[in-house]
Amino acid sequence: DWAGTETILDGIDDSINGNIDIIETGITIDNVHTSFLVKTKEPMFTASEGTTVRILIDSDNNQNTGYYYPGIGADHLVEVYGEETGTVSSAMLYGFDNSRGKDDWNGFFSLTNIKANSTSAKGISTAIELQIANFDIGIDAGDGLKYLITASDLSGNMDITNVIDLSRNEYTYDESVSDRREITNSFRKGQLDGIDIDGEFTDWNS
């Protein structure tokens, strides 16, 4: 049912574990649900120690709310876990408590279970699809949305996509850090001595 939906390709072999090497992602939104597709190089839920797929969702497209990761403020988190059998063991949606620090991972709290499936008619699949009720993540079509996807194993290996928006534009980690720095430094331009606190040091040479 994802046929005809435009997806985004991710780099192959950027993780040493093919089970968590994300190679393709997709998103589609209708009036009721937001659905995600995640494909990996090899079947993801086949390791005995378990595999976790997480999606950080900036539901209001505002970096100043939610958990901060360069490029987004994650208001919601999806966590899908599976092991050995090739099937999903658990799939949970979390919200973020904005009274907590923006770098506090424990600020996420559980909201509800969600639908997720990693199997196909032919057996174990290299893809999972999941679906979230729009009401649960408070989507406003006028605000847009950004997200990123991670896949990790218990050995510490991880693959992370770029930040992606609904127009399928991608924002790399380095670009997002640079943009954030420019915004911050714009408030620290030197008025008297000509020194700008911007991380560039050429103005000290004059």
Predicted regions and their residues:
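Acidic/polar low-complexity flexible segments
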Residues: 1, 56-83, 123-125, 134-205
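A short beta-turn/strand-edge loop motif at beta-sheet boundaries
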Residues: 15-16, 43-49, 136-141
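Beta-strand-rich interaction surfaces with strong enrichment in secreted/lumenal proteins
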Residues: 23-27, 114-120, 185
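Extended extracellular/luminal ectodomain segments enriched in beta-structured repeat modules
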Residues: 29-35, 48-50
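Short, well-ordered beta-strand segments enriched in hydrophobic/aromatic residues
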Residues: 32-42, 55, 126-134, 199
